[in-house]
């Protein structure tokens, strides 16, 4: 069941990336991110309030948000900072790079998570899982090389560096999620970390963007900004429940979630008219084969 949830989360993440790319086209990055945190928190705020003031309504359901103290909230605040750091780097990078380049670089996260999971949680992979992991790593590497044909110098492009930092902090977030899910309710973590991100973003907007807003790309409203929040919240909700299963493996869940690159690739080809699709499509077939071996290895 947890593997099915991981694949569902991957599909939702692909839509999230596509809506994010559209929202950031010729738009100010920080306001888009700020609105995303607001809409995401508004989605979960009713569940927080109902659980606190009318506890019997959601009691025992997957939408219940347990009432906890500071000793728990401090761990969720840490997650908020980690995730927001990854998002800031990722949003700036995605604005300036093709979606079919960003996807493969983001797909290196499972490699980092795999190493971390083996070191921190003692996870061990069977033969099928190792085959799946190696195929996925190879395919992501080849897909990244295809991007060089578009004239993007990976060594000297600061936006590439931003995406790499987003992948690194995203991997740290994934490992931290596995730690949190061993002891905390998934709905508790997802609800409150979205709320805390709004408060973290307020000073960032006021100090970094607002004073210089007339000197940079102006902000424009786009309805796809709401789509970012909807697909992200749905993807994360499914993801947290996948990790809450006792036998779930963060290294596999993280790898499967990166198959969202397939969905974002389709959007990049059909809606954003990106280049070098033939060579990238061949690489994507390896991604799918790798995901199939991961599926075999978990049964």
Where are these regions (language model features)?
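Alpha-helical transmembrane segments of compact multi-pass small-molecule transporters, enriched
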Residues: 39-43, 105-119, 196-203, 235, ...
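Hydrophobic/small/kink-forming positions within alpha-helical transmembrane segments
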Residues: 14, 18, 45, 80, ...
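Membrane-interface interhelical linkers
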Residues: 1-21, 25-30, 35-81, 87-97, ...
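Structural signature of hydrophobic alpha-helical transmembrane segments
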Residues: 1-12, 65-82, 122-138, 187-199, ...
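Juxtamembrane helix-loop boundary signature in multi-pass membrane transporters
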Residues: 1-11, 108-168, 178, 276-299
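Juxtamembrane helix-start motifs in multi-pass secondary transporters
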Residues: 32-33, 102, 189
